Swiss-Prot record:
The keyword Protein biosynthesis applies. This is Arginine--tRNA ligase. It comes from Escherichia coli O1:K1 / APEC. Belongs to the class-I aminoacyl-tRNA synthetase family. PANTHER family: ARGININE--TRNA LIGASE, CYTOPLASMIC, ARGINYL-TRNA SYNTHETASE. One of its GO terms (biological process) is arginyl-tRNA aminoacylation. The gene is argS. It catalyses: tRNA(Arg) + L-arginine + ATP = L-arginyl-tRNA(Arg) + AMP + diphosphate. One of its GO terms (cellular component) is cytoplasm.
Amino acid sequence: MNIQALLSEKVRQAMIAAGAPADCEPQVRQSAKVQFGNYQANGMMAVAKKLGMAPRQLAEQVLTHLDLNGIASKVEIAGPGFINIFLDPAFLAEHVQQALASDRLGVAMPEKQTIVVDYSAPNVAKEMHVGHLRSTIIGDAAVRTLEFLGHKVIRANHVGDWGTQFGMLIAWLEKQQQENAGEMELADLEGFYRDAKKHYDEDEEFAERARNYVVKLQSGDEYFREMWRKLVDITMTQNQITYDRLNVTLTRDDVMGESLYNPMLPGIVADLKAKGLAVESEGATVVFLDEFKNKEGEPMGVIIQKKDGGYLYTTTDIACAKYRYETLHADRVLYYIDSRQHQHLMQAWAIVRKAGYVPESVPLEHHMFGMMLGKDGKPFKTRAGGTVKLADLLDEALERARRLVAEKNPDMPADELEKLANAVGIGAVKYADLSKNRTTDYIFDWDNMLAFEGNTAPYMQYAYTRVLSVFRKAEIDEEQLAAAPVIIREDREAQLAARLLQFEETLTVVAREGTPHVMCAYLYDLAGLFSGFYEHCPILSAENEEVRNSRLKLAQLTAKTLKLGLDTLGIETVERM
């Protein structure tokens, strides 16, 4: 049930009847304060100006055409021409019943689309570090939300599995007589990488051999391809352990590395030349873009093939977008890549559009994100100033959560404590990130993220268990409760019911904008409203069974909504804490 969409259409029709153009925007929003009702239509200002009317006068005319019978108990004009809408308690009660009767809590499915989501994208032969966290978990929350809404989602893990470094690695593995790379661990591989790089920089003979190996690898020599595949396998096997720990839905089947697009690159360069988009410049092949200017104010040149014949990331990204449209049949493509790559992507996509590889009707969206910072406001590092490995971060989260949970539950059996610590620790790291607007940098702070108060995973997980405990105490028969009516008489009942029915609106925003923090804010607000409702509207000691059962149903929908909302974020819930 999307009440905002329902009201928007009703107000829009009333505005048209009052003389507004057919494309008018009613601008129906959730009200910020309870005294302004549940929703507010703010579109009179802009439309009245076009019609040469006072906004309040237009609002008065709109009200004469606005039929919200059975939806709103009161509609009033406020200020210069805002229309405040107060939902009818009977309408709220009816839709709470409907939500409880549905596995999807009454959430409708929009028209199904094929949506490609590009996220995580670690590099082969390197361990995942904290820089991969945001893309991985924000992208996964978007994927979960889109799948819940019924879309066909194709996860694309664009791993860095190609480049000159592989010649260097294979040469070094050979030198160490460790061709059986399959028995190596990724941590070993990182050490090998460092040693190989050192030799590459210091030993010209070794560097020459590495360069020859790259040529052989790129020409398809089976021995070198096999060595390369082993390196990829080691990396992705280790990364899968991290994905599973993070409760992220990525699997090996979702890997679509840079190498996938290699066969397309010569054809793309030739095609861009044939279309007159790419030209020779100082030996390289370049596309000049009017939309981007260099320091001299001239069109910026984007190199797609170097003079030695090598291709660039831009060439791969052009091929990648083309593949996602032509082969995967994407209706929409989302890229969860950090904000520093924005200009690079915009340039690649400008070429994609000019070449006609992806039509304008298929959005290519850069859902960029900021950096994870330490308490000092600088990029998050180890004490020694090195990059923090993601596995080490998760180990520390688990250890801190274990201490926290043991302190609060000294008698809990060890296996139960471990399960709870895992849910709290991993949940805390993920939620701390997801609850921040992805476009901004954020401060990583263990104390804040593991707190049991505020907008944190432990607080949300505890709020869920608190609602469940009401049911345990009630010892209620589920079938008997299902048949009971919902009655809304108290203000706090109405406020909780109205917020519960805004779940679909919240999902819609997350799906459209790729902003999981909106879901976090909604769930946190919902938990707070339930707390106030529980305090002021007795459930188990209600004045009669009818009121008790009705309030239990509000509690039941709260628990279901919290669980489902946290699930779309990839945050695990527990029955007891």
